Amino acid sequence: MNTEPLQPLEAEVETVSASDFRFDGGAATYWGTGLLATIITVFTFGLGYPFALVLLERWKAKHTYIEGRKLKFNASAWGLIGRWILWVLLTIITFGIYSFWVQPRIMRWKIEHLEFDATSTADNPAPAEGRSDVPAFRFDGGAATYWGTGLLAFLVTIFTLGLAFPFALVLKLRWKAKHTYIEGRQVSFDGTGFGLFGNWLKWMFLTLITVGIYSFWIQPRLIKWSVEHQSLS
């Protein structure tokens, strides 16, 4: 007779292989951080946006693991604010034309200021050897393909009255993954619109029957889904 103790189901579900991307952020800390970021942005008339952005990116990195290693966002708002003011001025003097370059540059700044958290060595394996000459995180996406993909995603969402949002989101996530490299390895995204569609309908239904309360859980779950459908090639 087998006398080994039964293992809890939860432990089985939480087991993550070293090759996985994992995200463990929850709704409470997400909305707490988001509220603070919104207050900073609103009360500074947008000038404090870099500080708000850093708050959100630090929260996301703190809850993200790649191949067992925890991420860390190493940028400061002061490192972005000069560029942010410059981009705003260039957008004004070009009558909005320069704005097409702002979002891809912010995305690049966010990705290239990520690193693996060296203080978590007790839980995280050491970085792979032989890659010290390769930037840990690199992004090479440009404005043309960013806005082309964004326009297609927008049209897909609008012409389906929002029902095809999961397919639009997947378009954008695949584009981002295609242009992101970690220690020289390209990120791949294997999520599909159909794979998210069922969850999306369920979340909308739960939001409806809870009179909007469930909506607080949707964004963190979208982030988790987006992160955990990535891998390194």
Go through each PLM region and give its residues.
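Membrane-interface extramembranous regions at the lipid-water interface
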Residues: N2-L36, A52-I85, V102-L152, A168-L201, ...
